[in-house]
């Protein structure tokens, strides 16, 4: 795969997304179905009630079709490509079921946490067994300094990594355009890492997702015409975790995905502080809602969080190369 060919997956996935998204939005508007605002969410987000959701279906399908087609075209139809795409499909389906229940069954909480966790763990187990059957290493890279052999416990780590980051990205998806922008930066960084490792199958997936996210962004930027839904955010988080594992650069996701980590940490700290001390650390969690309550606009939050993601990704590449 030549560097001049990197635009092909981006353009194909982008074209599919921008072509189908207006039809998808039109369908939801015709059915008068849309986002159901959570009762524990910010009150000012009530104006977003009824906005079409599940836009992740479009850019995920575009990414899937493009990855498979380009994998065949560039002779990169590998086990790595297929197992990563398996996570895309499974976690996407989990998110789809969650969104479907919220939108069409009018239950604002969707699947319960136990149901989601069972599906996420199942995906992690399948990923691990395929990963080991293909002879991949069961050692954990510790910040490029040392490698620790985990044996069967690497399977536990894989499950933790996939579940943790799929939920982290899901928590981050609460501001118009935020995850679409952060995702583009994150997958762009992993495309560079994969290119340096000559794992072109992973490059194809990253570029396909980037094309889909770029095509989705004009419809998701404030004021959003459509949200990606859990179908998009759960799949994107699972994909990032799976890619970091396949590239054997797991630690990099802590830095590349620092915003996702901080969003999750803010929720954990908020809950722990309230239960232990009866006090809240933040005005609201995840932390992007805290900044909203401090008077920041959604665009300002987007810009600051994207900047953090870009800087952290740059530092990661500097450390590696």
UniProtKB/Swiss-Prot annotation:
Single Gene Ontology BP annotation: cell wall organization
The protein's role, per its UniProt record: Catalyzes the initial step of the lipid cycle reactions in the biosynthesis of the cell wall peptidoglycan: transfers peptidoglycan precursor phospho-MurNAc-pentapeptide from UDP-MurNAc-pentapeptide onto the lipid carrier undecaprenyl phosphate, yielding undecaprenyl-pyrophosphoryl-MurNAc-pentapeptide, known as lipid I.
Organism of derivation: Enterococcus faecalis (strain ATCC 700802 / V583)
EC number(s) reported in the record: 2.7.8.13
Keyword Cell membrane: yes
Bilayer-spanning residue ranges: 6-26, 54-74, 77-97, 117-137, 143-163, 175-195, 200-220, 226-246, 251-271, 301-321
Compartments in which it is found: Cell membrane
Superkingdom of the organism of origin: Bacteria
Protein name: Phospho-N-acetylmuramoyl-pentapeptide-transferase
Pathway entry: Cell wall biogenesis; peptidoglycan biosynthesis
Family: Belongs to the glycosyltransferase 4 family. MraY subfamily.
GO cellular component annotations of the record: plasma membrane
Keyword Cell division: yes
Cofactor dependency: Mg(2+)
Topological relation to the membrane, as annotated: Multi-pass membrane protein
